[in-house]
Amino acid sequence: MIDLDFRKLTIEECLKLSEEEREKLPQLSLETIKRLDPHVKAFISVRENVSVEKKGKFWGIPVAIKDNILTLGMRTTCASRILENYESVFDATVVKKMKEAGFVVVGKANLDEFAMGSSTERSAFFPTRNPWDLERVPGGSSGGSAAAVSAGMVVAALGSDTGGSVRQPASLCGVVGYKPTYGLVSRYGLVAFASSLDQIGPITKTVRDAAILMEIISGRDENDATTVNRKVDFLSEIEEGVSGMKFAVPEEIYEHDIEEGVSERFEEALKLLERLGAKVERVKIPHIKYSVATYYVIAPAEASSNLARFDGVKYGLRIKEKGLREMYMKTRNVGFGEEVRRRIMIGTFTLSAAYYEAYFNKAMKVRRKISDELNEVLSQYDAILTPTSPVTAFKIGEIKDPLTYYLMDIFTIPANLAGLPAISVPFGFSNNLPVGVQVIGRRFADGKVFRIARAIEKNSPYNENGMFPLPEVKA
């Protein structure tokens, strides 16, 4: 085994390796997974062996794919019993682009079932553990992807973000997580949760690596009508700093319970940006306080429609019963976990004729208000800044109450409701656990979001050799 520390190996560093070293990267990744994953449990499926083709600029670099993104030749389970043995007949567009660029998919990462959760405890198979503390959650729903990168099992990963599911686990695991502007990345091959909110995004060790992956996976796709034919440059201005920029901090975030250490790191990040020549001001965004409530009407409604296809007829689990109705009911009751069933029921209720106007339609109006207010602020400021998560990683099994659990995404949900680009960049610790700072930008100003995040990363007093230090998992 070549002497390379995967915890410190970035995409850019991989490009500097010799041809012989790059040939061995996928096997080294598999060996690291074999050694560490019994403790971290980041993967649902892992390839037994991989072949390396020297095609594409990024050939040989090992990555993980969240297990709700379709991959040819590997299971796509969505961490659900109902799709436990499902194999797709095609690659998702993002996977196809990654493979064409030369990346090697070594495994499929664990998640909360159908991406419904914020801790990766709600996988039908097993909870994933945070590499910083194996008794704690990695966040979710892309917890497996974040943990795999944080533990140094892969160089990078893809996740999906519906209400913070890339950014929140990135924050809790001390890595970078990016949600693009809605429409920049194809959702073709992503098993839908809430179609108007879902976006695929990268999880990496550095901001530059995330921008590199966005250059690869973004672009118009004829298979996804919501993608836009618009070229965004993610890298050309990434090193230009923040001098002269203006940032907005919503006053409403201070109305919520924020862990003391998280609040301290956030204020420290704001002072850093001011020292770098930026101006930071507090602003009012009145309707942002309704983001979580709005999300938990709209997302379950869309999920109840999207998940109706999993009925035991065409693919996935099928429980034999006497009649069709009984088969439907038994299959869905056995195949879906508690949280998925809860959200399907909520969504079905809010879409019903008697309650559609009172709940779903009203939530859509509030969503528009939130979006308008965010866009108004962003017309006057370069970005909105918040903590990524109000807390650091909590202990597995600690949170039982669904409402407390839902509030984990209180700072990340607004960007999904408005379709805005947002990134979580690691910045220091609270009680020896990573803290993330979130940057939210204007639609299609993804390049500027990366530029701001890079300035934070580049000047952070907590980073070593240009990146946040990652933990050593005791195997």
From Swiss-Prot:
Family membership: Belongs to the amidase family. GatA subfamily.
Enzyme class: ligase
Function: Allows the formation of correctly charged Gln-tRNA(Gln) through the transamidation of misacylated Glu-tRNA(Gln) in organisms which lack glutaminyl-tRNA synthetase. The reaction takes place in the presence of glutamine and ATP through an activated gamma-phospho-Glu-tRNA(Gln).
GO cellular component, one term: glutamyl-tRNA(Gln) amidotransferase complex
Annotated organism of origin: Thermotoga maritima (strain ATCC 43589 / DSM 3109 / JCM 10099 / NBRC 100826 / MSB8)
InterPro entries: Amidase, Amidase_CS, Amidase_dom, AS_sf, GatA
GO biological process assignments: translation
Reactions this protein catalyses: L-glutamyl-tRNA(Gln) + L-glutamine + ATP + H2O = L-glutaminyl-tRNA(Gln) + L-glutamate + ADP + phosphate + H(+)
Name under which the protein is recorded: Glutamyl-tRNA(Gln) amidotransferase subunit A
EC numbers, comma separated: 6.3.5.7
UniProt xrefs under HAMAP family: GatA
